[in-house]
């Protein structure tokens, strides 16, 4: 099932019993976080707060609170189907040369489909049904969540930020949290390596002193939202990928005040500029680590215009100690990552990002080991192949007889197949999440790799232990007798 816009997705979720309308007044200040957190931990439905205290605009929360709803948003019927999306991305990232004419013809439909999903620009769009400009702009009219008691101010969380660098034809889509500091100003918290920050830096170099155009889409269709957090190849735009997920081209409309193009069916659009040099201290905020982050300075985004649909819906979330929505997204997108990694490293049999590891800070890899040192090659590959894992602090690699998603198995492998000194890889001075206060320097820290595989000659001089395996005939006989034993 594919969804044209957020409202279409809401209807689809409601028909499946995956969305609950909340008629009781609930405040965006702390209360929505409590309700959404309890619901997410119970694997409950998406929530549409129809009467947020003090506001006329409904708030949509816990939208991607289960892996199943993430899969639905990507046009898949089950989480398992996300592997097929991963296979498509793996192919597009590094397409294999055709083995012959027949093979070339078989791959042609894939490329034709990708080309046919180029975004479609429209003149009129529902996201511009209502236009608010100049002194009438007031972010205080939006039910922006204040998520945690120690948060400094309301925080925009699901904004899809649209930018374009001066040297690029393609726009960048990124999701960056935005602290509200005035009726028309927010702080754009983008890290220096992220697409929006790179576009801004290039703009300042080429157009010194000139304001940098920015747009933020709130309440886009699910395919576009999820396309912005998926490892899309650099040769494929997020909008085109969203079209592939949705099954039809993404409709875009030109902003009223710039040449940026935004999702035409989004609920709310913020248009404006960043004035070079205008910075402000951001935070503290409770984040996905379960802690409040330290204060740091980031650019200020001045909102010059708000356009929106009639009776818009505000899409929001919170981040905190896992499980939260980012952790659930990580669980679902994990299935997309597996085929992409296997394309580069066919020896990998599974890859798992434990949600307890704050979405990406720890990875467990199982593999078919083929030579001494092989596990170390794989762990180094995980850190370097996809930029999504540049902040992964711990990589555990073990054999394919281990279930990467079962801590009982993983811990057994670590404690029986590892020598701490020989099998631990430490790398210093590597990129680390700026929200990671455990690193000695902000944005720079170490990584640890754990080789929990069976050791080959060259890695050890000792006779390696043999795993105990039960006798299959005895197991079958006891299976047949079990009911007669009266044990359970």
UniProtKB/Swiss-Prot annotation:
Which NCBIfam families does the entry link to?
PRK10922.1 (NF008175), UbiD family decarboxylase (TIGR00148)
Family classification: Belongs to the UbiD family.
Q: Catalytic center at which residues?
A: 287 (proton donor)
What is the protein name for this chain? 3-octaprenyl-4-hydroxybenzoate carboxy-lyase
Q: How does it assemble?
A: Homohexamer.
What is its subcellular localisation? Cell membrane
> What catalytic reaction does the record list?
a 4-hydroxy-3-(all-trans-polyprenyl)benzoate + H(+) = a 2-(all-trans-polyprenyl)phenol + CO2
What this protein needs as a cofactor is:
prenylated FMN; Mn(2+)
Query: Quick one: which residues bind Mn(2+)?
Result: 172, 238
**Gene Ontology terms, cellular component aspect?**
cytosol; plasma membrane
Report the pathway entry: Cofactor biosynthesis; ubiquinone biosynthesis
GO molecular function, a single term: 3-octaprenyl-4-hydroxybenzoate carboxy-lyase activity
Q: Which domain of life is it from?
A: Bacteria
Which EC numbers characterise this protein's activity in its record?
A: 4.1.1.98
Chief subcellular location equals membrane
Membrane topology annotation: Peripheral membrane protein
Q: Which residues bind prenylated FMN?
A: 175-177, 189-191, 194-195
**Top EC group:** lyase
On cofactor binding, the record's note says:
Binds 1 prenylated FMN per subunit.
Origin species: Pseudomonas putida (strain GB-1)
What Pfam families does the entry give? UbiD, UbiD_C, UbiD_N
Report any one BP term from Gene Ontology: ubiquinone biosynthetic process
